Amino acid sequence: MLASISIYDDDQVHNFLKCHFLHWLESLSLIGRLQESIGMVDTLMAIIDQIKGSEISRFLYDAKRFILSYYSIIDSSPLQLYSSTLIFAPQRSIIRNTFHNYTPDWILQEPNTDLEWNAVLQTLEGHSDWVRSVAFSTDSKLLASASDDSTIKI
């Protein structure tokens, strides 16, 4: 069914995301389903019209980087979407610039941030000591990590 569907610049999906992307993430976080956001963005990226979808393609790429970079903050404190995540996003981030007007007025000076996203996509969290070993499952969908704290996380 997805093969017959495509999204493109300034269509309903793109306009919805330009207005409500942060609200959508906040809602998913509040109902405990933030982890589904990455898969949803991936699905949208897969159905972009390659000719008429360059702007939505850049938006979704930036959106995915934004989610991956600030996942733990959004998951634990969804309202930080409107302050901490926006002001610490790279200066040229499409999400930061699209939703800059959501930054609270009480933030008088924004920190100096990188211009672009760096190479870090995601960090492992949850171990209390050095991680000494990591391995992917055979289907590449899971990652296991072993730590000096005598724990294994999947």
What spans do the regions from the language model cover?
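A detector of tandem-repeat and repeat-rich interaction/domain scaffolds
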Residues: 112-154
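Extended acidic/polar alpha-helical scaffold segments
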Residues: 1-119
